[in-house]
């Protein structure tokens, strides 16, 4: 019985120490996983879809490159 209570208390302490990931970081991680964008030259990868890392929209110019719009 004591071991079960100890296990529950330890589990509660571990879960209380884990901080939730902010939504912006989750979005950044998912965009990076899709191929990412190139913020240093304001171009985005064609595989990223309609979004860039900085949440700017992309205007598709060709299959290989697209310019990010403000």
Swiss-Prot record:
Keywords: Amidation, Disulfide bond, Knottin, Neurotoxin, Secreted, Signal, Toxin
Any one Pfam family match given in the protein's UniProt record, by short name: Toxin_7
Keyword hit for Signal: yes
Tissues with expression: Expressed by the venom gland.
Cystine bridges: 37-53, 44-58, 52-68
Record's subcellular location: Secreted
PTM annotation (Leucine amide): residues: 69
Propeptide boundaries: 21-34
One GO cellular component term: extracellular region
GO molecular function terms noted in the UniProt entry: toxin activity
Signal peptide range in chain numbering: 1-20
Comment field on protein domains: The presence of a 'disulfide through disulfide knot' structurally defines this protein as a knottin.
Family: Belongs to the neurotoxin 01 (U2-agtx) family.
Main function: Insect active toxin causing rapid but reversible paralysis in crickets. No activity shown in mammals. Does not show effect on mammalian voltage-gated calcium channels.
Protein's name in the database: U2-agatoxin-Ao1r
